[in-house]
Amino acid sequence: MDINQMTYAVQGALQKAVAYSKEYELQNIEVEALLKAAMNENDSLFKSILERANIDVDQLIKAYDNQLSHYPTVQGDNVQYGQYISAKTNELLDKAEKYMKSYEDEFISMEHILRAAIDTDETTQKWVGNKVEVIKEIITKVRGGNHVTSQNPEVNYEALEKYGRDLVEEVRQGKMDPVIGRDEEIRNTIRILSRKTKNNPVLIGEPGVGKTAIVEGLAQRIVRKDVPESLLDKTIFELDLSALVAGAKYRGEFEERLKAVLKEVKESEGRIILFIDEIHMLVGAGKTDGAMDAGNMLKPMLARGELHCIGATTLNEYREYIEKDSALERRFQKVGVSEPDVEDTISILRGLKERYEVYHGVRIQDRALVAAAELSDRYITDRFLPDKAIDLVDQACATIRTEMGSNPTELDQVNRRVMQLEIEESALKNESDNPSKHRLEELQEELSNEKEKQSSLKSRVEQEKEKIAKVQEKRAELDSSRQALEDAQTEGNLEKAAELQYGTIPQLEKELQKFEEAFQDETGEDSERMIREVVSDEEIGDIVSQWTGIPVSKLVETEREKLLSLSDILHKRVVGQDKAVDLVSDAVVRARAGIKDPNRPIGSFLFLGPTGVGKTELAKSLASSLFDSEKHMIRIDMSEYMEKHAVSRLIGAPPGYVGHDEGGQLTEAVRRNPYSVILLDEVEKAHSDVFNVLLQILDEGRLTDSKGRSVDFKNTIIIMTSNIGSQVLLENVKDAGEISDDTEKAVMDSLHAYFKPEILNRMDDIVLFKPLSVNDMSMIVDKILTQLNMRLLDQHISIEVTEEAKKWLGEEAYEPQFGARPLKRFVQRQIETPIARMMIKESLPEGTIIKVDLNDNKELDFKVVKPTS
């Protein structure tokens, strides 16, 4: 028999049969080896048909194995297993060839092998029994009137089921979420589908606005019979393009698969509507040398009206792929899908609420849905409603569900504490010194208390979990009853529908309410429970904060205190600049209270003053206070932007230039951390054209980068520092450190000479930093010495400096034109260097105190006080 007269699947089965012959040490390829191989082929048609006939294929494979183990084996060094085809196998293949001819096929396929096995193999006959006619019917249905004209015929069998999914059937089975709104777009789609020619709508809109949902909504309307008569008998198949392309090994196989799909659609005589999501992928799909792409294969059928098709794609991809192919474009009718507003999104979320409650086993408050729509619209700017709002709700539900499945935080902390104490206890038991024994007694008492607390908490958690499970069970039961009601109404089973609507469902609703009320009474308010099962607006705010880094969740007590004392915290780090500190801290408080202008940055300030007076330090202090780290400050040194072309480094190189893919230093940093302090240091050093980029940031709180993406600056604090007018400030400052009106006017004149009015007009405030006074210097000395003590803490050494020595340090290092920086250098020389020499010269024990005083010669004396043992 010619192996080339067999399909690839049968050839593969023969090769596998050789391997099975080797496994069982058989010289011949027996029937059972071939049939077992046919069962184990990838996407085996042989196995699929038997499974549909409800035959236990696993047991049948075991029966084949059992038969193979009874054949006589051949052993030896040069034995070639599976070298010959046995007489029974030959008989089976001859029979398969006869079936091939009777089906008018060109190649022996798997269904021929199956029919031949039923006729010739006793084991197969035994397991098939009286299901021969059933198997024949299944084969006829699978073939669908096709003939085997290629060596890969399986791609043509039930192509739609293989490469698509029936949306109408999924709606009937209750697998689809409800579609809320979008009535106008669905009506437009129905109108286009009802046309005689060019009845192929293409849904165009941004990602996440609900294009696929419109098609799902149409499928739901077909099930509810809420469509014109011409669409009542229609079904919608979603084509999976990736499945069509995947595994197409041979030249022309992709086209063959697509042709089989289109043939089934054509033979349905308009009953099947094909939905192709991401339809732009058709253009160029499967195109190789000399091959035709999928888009060109669709055109003739679309033009003749033989193919009813709905496409969906985004605006950019439609422009890039479909519009270029004008012949394909004119065969589709565009349906624009715009982003819904916040109110419509809230309606959509309310419609989905019940499905998410049942799926996650939680309760979603209405204010959580409102918060999801509003917060996602305001803070998640690079995505679209309703997708981003639905994602927020889903994530919040998943968070609560995860918490419900694991130990509550309170119990988890107690468990960890118990474990920690037990480890410490076992370590201390090995020690014999008195402090260790004393600590062991204290520890054992604490451990006993913690274990008691642990037991009590565990008991509460178990009780609450049990009650929540009952509520969840009742919710799921209610949901399945509602689905059954829809099915009964669709099928016209009015008796069942009436029983469900007026009997079962009201009863379940009452029971659910009773369970929830009992749960509420027994466990108290939501805030008192160990296990949270409610999704509120706080959870939504937490998720937004996680995704964006912007604090939108409700203020906790510690954060309230932190914000109210922000001004005091900044005053400790920045000395002598009260006005600047108050302006910045007030801007942060306004933003966190939610009353700032939502379309502008939190605050934009220009700090003017001499070098070393605390301009940059204030920006660092603010970042450190808000984020507990100076790393959250985006620092741009404007001295690097002295050339006109350097502005491209802020927003990214234009298309075609090197570095276009990398993005801009400023825009990329803000995209990653939307809530941050931006410090533009030494702005006067930059080229004047660089400031034109800042215009829309300061006014609208946004900036478009080189890739056309809008970057949101509404949650940033922008601080610019400059030394413009510092000479005027130094020369005209009053003894008390106050700045006169004339001095301020002179500084402003210098500023106007450098900056354009449109830049200055957009800033919230221009703050003049006054030169530091001698009194300020003594406070800065305290700060520097505190930092030094912090560094010495690791070595358990501390320094004490007398007031007289501090005063001398401040006076000696005082240089008004240089600010605080000379003082830092002076302290390094006078205190840090001598202490470092002492530490290296003699090993100072832990607890050493170094006392620093001023002697009569105006020099510093260092006295080492070692701890008494």
Curated annotation (Swiss-Prot):
Quaternary structure and partners: Homohexamer. The oligomerization is ATP-dependent.
Organism: Staphylococcus epidermidis (strain ATCC 35984 / DSM 28319 / BCRC 17069 / CCUG 31568 / BM 3577 / RP62A)
Signal sequence extent: none
Compartmental location: Cytoplasm
Gene Ontology molecular function, alphabetical: ATP binding; ATP hydrolysis activity
Binding site for ATP 2: 609-616
Entry binding sites for ATP 1: 205-212
Stretches for region C-terminal: 772-869
Domain Clp R span(s) in chain numbering: 3-145
Region NBD1, annotated ranges: 158-339
Stated name of the protein: Chaperone protein ClpB
Cited Pfam families: AAA, AAA_2, AAA_lid_9, Clp_N, ClpB_D2-small
Main subcellular location: cytoplasm
Stretches for region Repeat 1: 6-71
Function: Part of a stress-induced multi-chaperone system, it is involved in the recovery of the cell from heat-induced damage, in cooperation with DnaK, DnaJ and GrpE. Acts before DnaK, in the processing of protein aggregates. Protein binding stimulates the ATPase activity; ATP hydrolysis unfolds the denatured protein aggregates, which probably helps expose new hydrophobic binding sites on the surface of ClpB-bound aggregates, contributing to the solubilization and refolding of denatured protein aggregates by DnaK.
Keyword Chaperone: yes
Name of the coding gene: clpB
Region (NBD2): 559-771
